[in-house]
Regions:
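Membrane-proximal intrinsically disordered regions of secretory-pathway and membrane-system proteins
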Residues: 1-194
């Protein structure tokens, strides 16, 4: 693993045309859960920041909750943009390694628990500025790609390969950025999509 957070997606060959709208409607319960977990995630991020700055260590329990949150959000995000047909599980496993309950989306982490850079963590918000700017650009391009994919899937019943690869890359970038933001690693996330 070259970065301590990975995203893998097994794309289906065909996507039912109704999923371009149906998946968004079906994901409403997950969106509510993500909203509530987002509140928990904010508290966990603040606690992690305080603990790492004071001790130089990240407790495994805090890291596990962050891993679960990122994994859950990623699985639901892939479903919302109609890249998959199976309904994402309501899975709240806090292990760093994916438990395999969702065979289409795999998100693994290798959180750094010991020997953390207190200085890097202390200034994390400043260090994130370039990543956030690049992430906003990738996000805008991903929204445009999703609009094109909406019509492509509606007409063809499948994702065009180039668009699919681009959206998978943006998801990979998002998982890495989230791991850095959530203090799971001090390794700066690559700004590319590979």
């Amino acid at each position: 693993m070259d970065y301590p957070a990975t995203f893998e997606f097994n794309a289906p060959e065909r996507v039912a045309r109704w999923r371009v709208i149906g998946n968004l409607i079906l994901s409403i319960p997950h969106i509510i859960v993500i909203y509530l977990l987002g509140i928990v995630g904010t508290v966990i991020d603040v606690l992690s920041w305080i603990v790492i700055v004071l001790t130089g260590k990240l407790p495994a329990g805090l890291a596990g909750v962050s891993c679960m949150l990122i994994r859950y959000q990623t699985r639901v995000g892939v479903f919302i943009v109609f890249m998959r047909s199976s309904y994402p599980p309501f899975d709240f496993d806090t292990s760093s390694q994916d438990n395999g309950k969702d065979p289409e989306v795999t998100v693994n982490f290798e959180p750094e628990l010991e020997g953390r850079s207190r200085l890097s963590v202390f200034f994390r918000f400043i260090l994130l500025i370039p990543v956030v700017i690049v992430g906003m650009l990738w996000g805008i391009l991903a929204e445009l790609a999703a609009i094109v994919a909406f019509f492509a899937v509606l007409i063809l019943g499948r994702w065009p390969k180039g668009l699919l690869n681009f959206i998978v890359g943006v998801n990979r970038f998002s998982v890495r950025t989230s791991a850095y933001w959530s203090l799971l690693t001090d390794k700066y996330p690559p700004l590319g999509l590979s």
